[in-house]
Amino acid sequence: MKAAEIREKFLKFFESKGHTIVRSSSLVPGNDPTLLFTNSGMVQFKDVFLGAETRPYSRATTAQRSVRAGGKHNDLENVGYTARHHTFFEMLGNFSFGDYFKRDAIHYAWELLTTVYKLPADKLWVTVYHDDDEAYDIWAKEVGVPAERIIRIGDNKGARYASDNFWQMGDTGPCGPCSEIFYDHGPGVWGGPPGSPEEDGDRYIEIWNLVFMQFNRDAQGNMTRLPKPCVDTGMGLERIAAVLQHVHSNYEIDLFQQLIKASARETGVADLANNSLKVIADHIRACSFLIVDGVIPGNEGRGYVLRRIVRRAIRHGYKLGRKGPFFHKLVADLVAEMGAAYPELKEAEQRVTDVLRQEEERFFETIEHGMSILEAALADLDAAGGKTLDGELAFKLHDTYGFPLDLTADVCRERGVTVDEPAFDDAMARQREQARAAGKFKATQGLEYTGAKTTFHGYEEIAFDDAKVVALYVEGASVGEVKAGESAVVVLDHTPFYAESGGQVGDQGVLANAATRFAVADTLKVQADVIGHHGELEQGVLKVGDAVRAEIDAARRARTARNHSATHLMHKALRDVLGSHVQQKGSLVDADKTRFDFAHNAPLTDDEIRRVEAIVNEQVLANAPGIVRVMPYDDAVKGGAMALFGEKYGDEVRVLDLGFSRELCGGTHVHRTGDIGLFKIVAEGGVAAGIRRVEAITGDNAVRYVQALDARVNAAAAALKAQPSELIQRIGQVQDQVKSLEKELGALKSKLASSQGDELAQQAVEVGGVHVLAATLDGADAKTLRETVDKLKDKLKSAAIVLAAVDGGKVSLIAGVTADASKKVKAGELVNFVAQQVGGKGGGRPDMAQAGGTEPANLPAALAGVKGWVEERL
């Protein structure tokens, strides 16, 4: 049974049991800033389990794309060397949100494994938490698993509830026992059952974990039963595929075999068991899907992890003899294997390929030199019998050649060598480098709020009377009142304030009553449906239970709405002008501007920018109405609405039709496109490989910008004594005049240099049959210096010459040596002798070289030393 069929059967089985098939969420978590990557099926449901979000279904099933590389969950260094470690994997799961519990979860799992997948029942073992008698009895008395194949696992990690069979979301919150299902590969494979001293062997392999969330743990460690217990299960697709395909390594399943063959094709390796091929096959999955989800190789956070994975794959290809870009060519093979299950991969194929190719080209520019340095160091270390690589060298490889520390460590590990990481860290600190380790994401200080959700009125109103204060927070702690001068977060039962999301900034404004006034500087979400008003109490005392009038800064909101609506129109215009590959990769919409990041591999031309502006302004002039509808997500997407990168959507979504644009959006917008007034792009540039950024302004900001531009044009025209309409023509005339004058100046300099050259030739000193000359040529540029050196070489026949010129505190140097003398006196060495004394460096051919410097005060002494330097070499 192939992996694709296993995935399909899993989802269809649970759909037949009343579960809603929910699409895989992004690898970039939209609801958990503490998590680097989505690493399990439950991540997208975390807020549901915590009660902060509701869904229209109580049963769900998913095939979740997951990554474990960086931070707490880091499998990177093991990938390729073990049978079951991966950076990217698929987690099959079924979930119950207060619906069914242990009995159904266990029966469903058993039915799927034994009836649908047809695994022999006598090959399956199960574990339960040691005091979970309920689960034990279901397995033993209802399912019929013999007692000798049911193992109770106690607290085996040093504390109460610290067990492989007790799951906890964190130090507090939902938790509960779990039951794991193992497959027995038989006595031909070494290993013992779970809980035994030999449990780390490969005979008994965990294939499914059933988590029963039935408790809530408070800060004191007390456990209370949840009113609605939940189920969260996870089964790795690669693991169950290995079992069903009767192989012992995940890399032997059909999906990986095709990618390994493709890796062998691109690297020219015949041995398909080579570990480096496994590394490459694994890494193309992680890298491709991370790029699909908007991650771009970089030097921080997620981008840094992606860069590490890409470079690790490249290094293994290099190890196999591939000295040029190859990794990006595997994207097509991955699409062939997984494109049907994940259409987003196929849609992004060209973009993924381009990003990987660019990253490869960048790395291959430095890898050969860096690898040669590392190989030489390891050879020296081996000769000396050493086992630890100098941390300073590891840092040099990182700083100069772009080798992440773990890449250097990976190479060393293959030679039985470790890296002196403390020394590396010391070097990093001294250099004050900003490259950060992958897991340093900082969680925003959470506010513990358990009340009702906030009712948002901001789509219709700019103010709400009699809003009730339901919670107050000062420095993250819940308080009963706030005094004048204190900064706080206020939660209301009703508000017109929009909380920052979807790239749009939060509202500002005022909360006030007869006795108090609270200035709102920002509005952020405390939970999915709970809005926090951040600011300072300017007067009075504000207490929980007080009623206030909540009023936003309407002018600021209007400017923000104009920019947000213009962003939608610009997005559509960019797709029309550049192509359908354009996808939003980030945005910031505030009252001053809109900043829009999107997937595209080339700078926009002036013509493309003008076309985008024209299309958007045409939509503005059409004064089309903005129409908002709420509908199921699937219906919205089928109807042509665009879903945007980084956004987390529920099953009911808000669709905005604005002119020719249709997008899913929860932000605030203009009522008609004409309200935008005027649209103007003011900046365009690149922010990462394959990602461009456009900044634009609207309304009164755009009018002021155009007026200022007009004023500058008028001022420039006046300075050139021309009418504004004649400015381009006049600039052309001035440029022609400048070129003519530069040509005339060059001729004069050449004539002057020629006459000076005749005089300089007389200053040459003969040393060992070679004329040596070191002098300053006043007013000469680099071209004049070179021409003069050539003339002097012709005149003197056998010579070693250094000429210098000083301009604006900078030294220019040219050295020339005739062919007969260049075997002993090389121009590159000669010019560097002088350059080092004037704060510079240079180089070139044995007969001609140039250099520069920044310390002209040292030039006379440096030139005076040339005669002796040449004399030593003749």
Curated annotation (Swiss-Prot):
Main localisation: cytoplasm
GO cellular component, one term: cytosol
Pfam families given in the database record: DHHA1 (PF02272), tRNA-synt_2c (PF01411), tRNA_SAD (PF07973)
UniProt-listed CDD domains: AlaRS_core
Note accompanying the cofactor annotation: Binds 1 zinc ion per subunit.
Cofactor(s) demanded: Zn(2+)
A GO BP entry: negative regulation of DNA-templated transcription
Its EC number(s): 6.1.1.7
Catalytic activity: tRNA(Ala) + L-alanine + ATP = L-alanyl-tRNA(Ala) + AMP + diphosphate
Sorted UniProt keywords: Aminoacyl-tRNA synthetase, ATP-binding, Cytoplasm, Ligase, Metal-binding, Nucleotide-binding, Protein biosynthesis, RNA-binding, tRNA-binding, Zinc
Binding site for Zn(2+): 564, 568, 665, 669
UniProt-recorded Gene Ontology molecular function terms: alanine-tRNA ligase activity; aminoacyl-tRNA deacylase activity; ATP binding; tRNA binding; zinc ion binding
Family, as annotated: Belongs to the class-II aminoacyl-tRNA synthetase family.
PANTHER family: ALANINE--TRNA LIGASE, CYTOPLASMIC, ALANYL-TRNA SYNTHETASE
Protein name as annotated: Alanine--tRNA ligase
Gene: alaS
